[in-house]
């Protein structure tokens, strides 16, 4: 059964680059969201066991999404993928429950070790 994966970024190009960086042989069903509100909607519909999340988005940013997921005690593996590397960002996303922080652009080489570490990809 395909693993539901959600790619969240306000940039369609960034979503495309990230999707292309996912392992080609990974059995997944990918959904896309362009903002945090839609990301939470997809999650509540059961379409996100793994979420690749940008931090800087209109409407609801990645930090707000992480905070809401944590408040609701939701079970999802969140990998933050962002170009916004501000001091303290890594610590903040980890405190909010993200399993990893990947600097854009994402690549298969950056993602596979994280996915393997959490048993999401073999």
Model-derived segments and their meaning:
Residues 12-31:
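Two-component/phosphorelay signaling modules centered on CheY-like receiver
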Residues 35-38, 61-64:
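Acidic catalytic/metal-coordinating carboxylates
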Residues 46-52:
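Active-site beta3 strand of CheY-like receiver
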Residues 57:
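Receiver (REC) domain active-site loop signature in two-component systems and cognate sites
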Residues 106-116:
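C-terminal output helix
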């Amino acid at each position: 059964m395909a693993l539901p994966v959600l790619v969240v970024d306000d940039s369609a190009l960034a979503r495309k680059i990230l999707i292309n960086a996912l392992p080609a042989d990974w059995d997944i069903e990918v959904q896309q969201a362009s903002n945090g509100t839609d990301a939470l909607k997809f999650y509540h519909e059961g379409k996100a066991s793994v979420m690749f999340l940008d931090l800087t988005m209109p409407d609801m940013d990645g930090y707000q999404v992480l905070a809401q997921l944590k408040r609701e005690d939701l079970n999802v593996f969140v990998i933050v993928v962002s170009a916004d590397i501000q001091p303290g960002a890594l610590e903040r996303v980890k405190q909010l429950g993200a399993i990893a922080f990947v600097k854009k652009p994402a690549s298969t080489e950056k993602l596979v070790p994280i996915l393997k570490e959490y048993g999401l990809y073999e």
